[in-house]
Amino acid sequence: LVSEETGRLARLIQNMLDLSKLESGEYQVNARMFNIWETLTGVALSAEQRINDGMIDIDGLTMDEKVLVYADPDLIHQVAYNLLDNAIKFTPAGGTIRFSVEKLGPEVEISIWNSGQGISPEALPYVFQRFYKEDRSRGLHARGAGLGLNICKVLVNLSGGQIRVESQQGEWCKFVFTLPTQPPNPGEMKRLPDESGRPFCYSMAYKVLHIHFRYRQKWD
């Protein structure tokens, strides 16, 4: 119990630090070409003990294929770790977590699928909102601060991709995100929505990205 609470607190602190970096006004991304399968395998190995303790089967991982993406490896490692952590939390003993990677033209689509209770249709639109506790939508005791999936969305968007969730309640859940396969044109401008739906801007140079992030405090 002590170990579980220590891990929960450590994850909460790390999530708050990640948000603090994003909200500081400027966030630097060091993007390069790398093999997404190496990242996914590394993330799975880092969670090996929890996977074994939960008697969960891992399917789809391969090092035989080389699929290159253009992004910051550290940020994508964090995204994949958060999504795998979420999958482990909601996969029952004897269940399965499945990784897949698919090339789609100028993008690569990465998915992490898990068997289990899934998410209700009513909850699906809200799972990426900050502080949303999807645990409640699954009839489980609330765990975590509801920050991990929101951080995933921000980091994937910063990397030039998109993220979505699909689910069949009572059967499975799948998180899917995309990443570019080539660097953007120097000086390319993009506009991404913040949580209120209003756009904020960031400018991307060839290797470094700077973001001006607007944070709106929410009061109960």
Protein language model annotation of sequence segments:
Residues 119-133:
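Short conserved segment of the HATPase_c
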Residues 30-35, 52, 57-67, 104:
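Conserved catalytic submotifs in the C-terminal HATPase_c
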Residues 160-161:
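Conserved glycine-rich
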Residues 94-106:
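Short beta-strand/loop element within the Bergerat-fold HATPase_c
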Residues 24-29, 68-71:
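Conserved micro-motifs of the catalytic ATP-binding
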Residues 4-9:
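Short alpha-helical segment of the dimerization/phosphotransfer core of two-component systems
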